[in-house]
């Protein structure tokens, strides 16, 4: 799998950005961004979503010129508005993107495309899904409230299809709950009690945690299954419209398609072929997978997302989080992977060690550390990498540091309590 890279400076809360590796942030199979509120986590995830979509649009438009410079950067800025990033651009903003077959660059008011390799035959068109933090919209079904924000609307449409796909039932990693569509064609959460009794709750009345993870897991699983099993039958209809492609302009005089801001005609047969071509992989971009969830459930949801990402070789999972539990469990996934490898080296024929490891951390979710990058955003506008090549979390990690501060606070208060008790004993003689 190729590692997509971006370099960002002076964009929203991002100032200097990442200062190692020539400033390029790497996106392997799994990338996670942590850090305090307003430090740029979602800025990076929204930006990579936009850039990957632009690469896909350029591929569908059959762009093959040595270079395409668009003097007006409105294409890029218009797309950024989809994620409400329009106000993040500054006069000194610098953005570079290195994808599978295309490089993109934004400087000043100029947006340029360059070939990354000799050809793009290896490019696998992705289905890109952005899971916004504001995804607990299931009560809308009951209240018939509109979904207006573009990311939410896109997720809502996929969720409707996912519900139908999993109508017979879908297990949720919360206390044995299960999603299903009942005989009355109502979407419900089924809870089986210890005595065998069954309780059903309409999804719109379910807990905030269930409303947060149900769209996330159903849509993630549904998209990957469609790509992995039925790709021939599920063409990428979202790319088929010329109107949706920012690199295509229809001549008002002749009604012919041209590359935007140029006099070069679009190769129509190639455009139609690529537009109808099925997606070959899934890029799943998730804001705050831990939202409204108890720590054990946070870990269960992460492991489910990791397992889904492993269903196809070229799937990618990009996460932003505030949760130390999500960070620590992602690191634990690399330890589990190394233990599985050691079990193979031991020739664990009976599977004793593998069974014990699997009980602790399922093999389906275990990740090679080389397939993971973990970054931390800071209030000063910088980005640092916080997991080493062996899968170990660095002590400087912000969330790790906060956990240590909490432990130190308790130690300090226990010491004060002990001192006060000793003082009380001395007074009472």
Which sequence ranges carry the predicted segments?
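Conserved hydrophobic alpha-helix in the ABC-type ATPase nucleotide-binding domain
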Residues: 300-305
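P-loop NTPase switch/coupling surface
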Residues: 1-186, 272, 311-314, 327-328, ...
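Walker B catalytic acidic pair
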Residues: 287-289
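Conserved D-loop-proximal element of ABC-family nucleotide-binding domains
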Residues: 294-295
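Conserved H-loop
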Residues: 321-325
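Extended helical coiled-coil dimerization/tether regions that scaffold
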Residues: 98, 105, 129, 133-279
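Loop/turn-to-beta-strand initiation segments
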Residues: 281, 313-318
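Walker A/P-loop NTP-binding motif
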Residues: 48-54, 219-223, 306-308
């Amino acid at each position: 799998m190729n590692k997509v890279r971006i370099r960002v400076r002076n964009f929203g809360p991002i100032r200097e950005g990442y200062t190692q590796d020539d400033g390029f942030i790497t996106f392997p199979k799994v990338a996670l961004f942590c850090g305090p509120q307003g430090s740029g986590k979602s800025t990076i995830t929204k930006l990579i979503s936009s850039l990957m979509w632009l690469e896909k649009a350029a591929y569908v438009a059959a762009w093959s010129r040595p270079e395409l410079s668009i003097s007006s950067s409105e294409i890029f800025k218009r797309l950024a508005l989809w994620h409400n990033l329009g106000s993040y651009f500054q006069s000194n903003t610098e953005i570079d993107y290195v994808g599978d077959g295309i490089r993109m660059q934004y400087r000043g008011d100029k947006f340029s495309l360059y070939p990354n390799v000799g050809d793009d035959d290896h490019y696998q068109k992705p289905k890109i899904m952005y899971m916004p933090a504001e995804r607990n919209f299931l009560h809308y079904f009951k209240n018939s409230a509109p979904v207006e924000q573009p990311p939410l609307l896109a997720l809502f449409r996929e969720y409707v299809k996912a519900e139908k796909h999993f109508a017979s039932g879908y297990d949720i990693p919360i206390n044995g709950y299960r999603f299903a569509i009942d005989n009355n064609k109502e979407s419900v959460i089924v809870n089986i009690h210890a005595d065998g009794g069954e309780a059903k709750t309409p999804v719109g009345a379910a807990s905030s945690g269930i409303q947060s993870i149900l769209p996330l897991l159903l849509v993630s699983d549904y998209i990957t299954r469609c790509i992995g099993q039925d790709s021939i039958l599920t063409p990428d209809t979202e790319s088929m419209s010329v109107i949706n492609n920012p690199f295509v302009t229809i001549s008002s005089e002749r009604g012919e398609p041209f590359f935007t801001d140029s006099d070069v005609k679009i190769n129509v047969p190639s455009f139609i072929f690529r537009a109808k071509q099925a997606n070959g992989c899934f890029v799943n971009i998730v804001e705050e997978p831990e939202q409204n969830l108890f720590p054990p459930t946070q870990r269960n949801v992460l492991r489910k997302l990791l397992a889904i990402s492993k269903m196809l070789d070229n799937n990618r999972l990009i996460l932003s989080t505030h949760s130390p539990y999500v960070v620590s469990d992602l690191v634990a996934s690399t330890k589990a992977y190394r233990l599985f490898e050691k079990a193979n080296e031991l020739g664990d024929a009976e599977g004793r060690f593998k069974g014990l490891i699997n009980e602790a951390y399922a093999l389906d979710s275990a990740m090679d550390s080389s397939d993971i990058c973990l970054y931390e955003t800071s209030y000063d506008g910088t980005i640092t990498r916080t997991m080493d090549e062996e899968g170990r979390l660095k002590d400087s990690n912000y969330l790790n540091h906060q956990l240590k501060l909490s432990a130190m606070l308790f130690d300090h208060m226990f010491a004060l309590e002990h001192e006060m008790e000793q003082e009380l004993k001395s007074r009472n003689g």
